[in-house]
A protein has these predicted regions:
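Short arginine-rich
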Residues: 140-147
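Long, low-complexity intrinsically disordered regulatory regions
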Residues: 178-181
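AMP-binding/adenylate-forming catalytic core of the ANL superfamily
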Residues: 2-114, 124-133, 137, 167
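AMP-binding/adenylate-forming catalytic domain of the ANL superfamily
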Residues: 109-133, 150-176
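Short, charge- and proline-biased low-complexity linear segments
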Residues: 20, 147-152
């Protein structure tokens, strides 16, 4: 029922919101019919540093790093910053994780605006009944230390090329808007 939208174009109409973004296109011959092209999934993109970021594209790249089992990428709000910063959640063997190699991998494979600012190491990624990765709860919990106390959260500070554990002091710097993202 939450995916059914009412009164979109006229009173009483009902539409099923699939989350797909499509556009009409001219194929050169239409025979009086409209043609549509799939563009993207709504909610699977976010804006950061005035650029559109596809969560699926970033996840596909991060999944090629040998120590990332499955990446779930989403955008999160940062105080005093426009748009949403990239964040990724994945599970891995944290003791053996090669942070320097991962940081270099991210810098080489992704443009700066698409590089995750935050990383959350989690026990297990949740999926829907159709095996899509769940993002809503992760997006809401984001990097907030009071909501993710059991997980390890890392941050890439502005101007730096490595991920470091997010501690309470730097969390406060982020929350008061003076981190400079």
């Amino acid at each position: 029922e939450e995916k059914v939208i009412s009164n979109v174009f006229e009173d009483g109409d009902r539409w099923f919101n699939t989350g797909d973004l499509i556009k009409t296109m001219d194929v050169g011959f239409s025979l009086g019919r409209k043609h549509y092209q799939f563009v993207d999934r709504v909610g699977d993109t976010f804006r950061w540093k005035s650029e559109n970021v596809s969560t699926n594209e970033v996840a596909e790249i991060l999944n090629t790093f040998d120590q990332v089992n499955m990446a779930n990428v989403f955008g999160v709000k940062v105080p005093q910053s426009e748009g949403r910063a990239g964040m990724v959640a994945f599970n891995c063997a944290i003791k053996d994780f090669k942070w320097n190699e991962f940081s270099e991998f991210v810098s080489n494979k992704l443009p700066s605006y698409a590089q995750p600012v935050f990383i959350r190491i989690i026990e297990e990624l949740e999926t829907t009944g159709t095996f899509k990765l769940k993002k809503n709860d992760l997006r809401e919990e984001a990097y907030h230390l009071d909501k993710v106390s059991d997980d390890n959260v890392f941050v890439k500070k502005p101007g730096e090329n490595k991920y470091v554990p997010l501690d309470k002091d730097y969390y406060e710097v982020i929350m008061n808007g003076s981190a400079g993202f």
